[in-house]
Amino acid sequence: MLVLVINSGSSSLKYQVRDVASHSVLTEGLIEKIGMGNGGEGDGEIEGPRDHAEALEQVDAAIHEVLGDRTLDAVGHRVVHGGERFGEPVLIDNEITRAIERLNPLAPLHNPANVLGIRAIAKKWPDMPQVAVFDTAFHRTLPEHAWRYAVPDSLYTNHGIRRYGFHGTSHEYVSHQAAALLDLPVEEFDGVIAHLGNGASVTAIRGGKSVDTSMGFTPLEGLVMGTRSGDLDPSILVFLGRAGWSTEDIDSLLNRESGLKGLAGNNDMRSVVEASEAGDARAATALAVASYRLAKYIGGYHVAVGGAKALVFTAGIGENSHLFRALVGDKLGALGVELDAGLNSQRSKEPRVISTAASLIPVLVVPTDEERAIAEATAAVVHSAS
């Protein structure tokens, strides 16, 4: 089955065509500045379109050059927020599209853009099966004590204020890969997965199910990220409001000017590491704060899963920054974690163990592949519906 995987943003459209049977990527690309001018990159030169419908025409042309007479069988969409309704991928129809739109208040920057992609596909290929794969779905198994905030019940019942979690597609995919590497059925996998990119989250997995995760009502909660603060005292927001900051100013501060950028002046982990190694005190502090925050979460989630059978690093930083992994590992000695310096420093695109034989908890690096996960989920839903 050939699946077109779509990640539709408000001004961008990322696409990839996967052959599900062979796991191969046939073509991929990114169209940017939709409605804003020219922009695009991929296997062919793509100029910026007026809207998502025009963007899709350009995607179609680029795909046709590669596929020739072969045709797409389905489209899988990354949808950021599935709320409490969607706990698994679903075949999209008009009612599902409207349900996703009703969740717009919970993800105002993402869900409306996801729907633009869905509607563009439906207009161009009305008979094409479309499947929504939700970032939040894997975390629908969180027990109430993990997803509840200690605020009046009316905030949950009237406004849906609770912890949802994100990066679920990645965490689920990586948990299966990690279990296979350890020769365990996924139903017996108890572990902690750290998805570390510009956005970062850590998830506690028990029996193959998510039982806690660091992101909450929004992707702002939790770890120190590229430009997001992660956890902080909520009274700081009240303090800033009383000092004259607008809600827009505070939102921008916490989501776009904080994290590594706020601490070190740069949101790119590679640059922060280089600066730290060159003696930059701000960069060293940023790494210390970020690694300490993650280590605290890992310790707590070791308890949440009843004793972790594995600690797994994934995503851009988790897969590639051996120095950051070492900083985190050094803080986990109380759990019996011991990284092998040689294995940790090796680069590979394959799942691998980077801990010593004496480590009480195996430490793994497992590359994530969200597009593959979305393509496989899409194929499964379409097959079950046929």
Curated annotation (Swiss-Prot):
For binding Mg(2+), which residues are annotated in this chain's numbering? N7, E370
Alphabetical GO CC annotations of the entry are: cytoplasm
Q: What is its EC number?
A: 2.7.2.1
Instruction: Supply the InterPro entries for this chain.
Output: Ac/propionate_kinase (IPR004372), Aliphatic_acid_kin_short-chain (IPR000890), Aliphatic_acid_kinase_CS (IPR023865), ATPase_NBD (IPR043129)
Residues under site feature: Transition state stabilizer: H167, R228
Q: Is Transmembrane helix given among the entry's keywords?
A: no
Cofactor(s) this protein requires: Mg(2+); Mn(2+)
Q: Which GO terms describe its molecular function?
A: acetate kinase activity; ATP binding; magnesium ion binding
List the transmembrane segments.
none
Q: In which pathway does it act?
A: Metabolic intermediate biosynthesis; acetyl-CoA biosynthesis; acetyl-CoA from acetate: step 1/2
UniProt-annotated binding residues for substrate: R78
Which GO annotations describe the biological process of this protein?
A: acetate metabolic process; acetyl-CoA biosynthetic process
Enumerate the active-site residues: D135
Q: Which family does it belong to?
A: Belongs to the acetokinase family.
Subunit structure comment from the entry? Homodimer.
Name of the protein in its database record: Acetate kinase
Q: Which organism is it from?
A: Arthrobacter sp. (strain FB24)
